[in-house]
C-alpha cells in the first residue's frame, strides 16, 4: 500500500517527469493556451451548428442555402486570415490576445442580432475569422514560439480546451 502511494506521489509530484515539470512551472501560459482554445469554440462549426435550425427557421433558409452561406463566410475568413495572421509577427501576444477576445465577443453580440441573409453571412464571417481563425492562430503561434523541446506537449495541453468546449458547451 505504501509503495503504491509513493509511486503515485513520485509520478505526479516529481519534477523529474518532463511532462509534469512543464505543467508545474508553465501552468499560467498553458492555461492561457487552453482557455484560448476553449474560447475559439464560438467560431467553430460544432458550436455554430447547434443553432442552425433556429437560424434557418428565422431566415427561412434551406439546409443547402445555409451551408452555402456558411461556406462563403468560411472561405472569405480564411482568405482574410492570410493577411491578418501577419499581426502575430508584429504585435505582442498580450495585445493580440486582448484584441482577439474583444473581437470574438463583439462578433458574438453581432451574430445574436442577425435578421437578414447579408447579416448572417457577415456574422458567420466575423465568428469564423475571430473565433476559429485568429483565436486558434494567436494561441498556437504563441505556444509554438515559447517552447522548443516541449512544443508538442504544450500544444497538446492547450488543445484540450477544444475537447473541454465540445464536452461542456451547449
Residue ranges and their predicted role:
Residues 150-170:
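Glycine-rich segments within core transmembrane alpha-helices of 12-TM secondary carriers
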Residues 38, 118-134:
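Hydrophobic core of transmembrane alpha-helices in multi-pass small-molecule transporters
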Residues 24-47, 126:
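Pair of pore-lining "gating" transmembrane helices in MFS-fold secondary transporters
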Residues 94-97:
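Primarily marks hydrophobic transmembrane alpha-helices of the MFS/SLC 12-helix fold
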Residues 74-82, 167:
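Residue-level signature of mid-helix packing/kink "hotspots" within the transmembrane helices
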Amino acid at each position: 500500500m505504501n509503495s503504491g502511494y509513493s509511486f503515485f506521489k513520485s509520478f505526479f509530484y516529481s519534477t523529474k517527469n518532463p511532462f509534469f515539470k512543464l505543467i508545474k512551472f508553465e501552468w499560467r501560459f498553458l492555461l492561457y493556451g487552453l482557455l484560448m482554445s476553449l474560447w475559439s469554440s464560438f467560431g467553430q462549426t460544432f458550436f455554430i451548428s447547434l443553432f442552425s435550425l433556429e437560424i434557418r427557421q428565422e431566415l427561412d433558409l434551406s439546409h443547402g442555402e445555409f451551408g452555402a452561406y456558411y461556406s462563403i463566410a468560411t472561405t472569405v475568413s480564411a482568405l482574410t486570415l492570410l493577411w491578418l495572421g501577419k499581426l502575430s509577427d508584429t504585435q505582442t501576444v498580450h495585445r493580440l490576445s486582448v484584441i482577439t477576445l474583444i473581437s470574438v465577443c463583439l462578433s458574438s453580440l453581432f451574430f445574436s442580432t442577425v435578421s437578414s441573409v447579408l447579416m448572417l453571412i457577415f456574422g458567420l464571417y466575423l465568428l469564423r475569422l475571430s473565433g476559429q481563425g485568429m483565436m486558434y492562430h494567436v494561441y498556437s503561434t504563441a505556444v509554438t514560439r515559447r517552447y522548443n523541446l516541449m512544443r508538442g506537449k504544450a500544444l497538446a495541453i492547450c488543445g484540450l480546451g477544444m475537447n473541454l468546449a465540445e464536452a461542456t458547451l451547449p
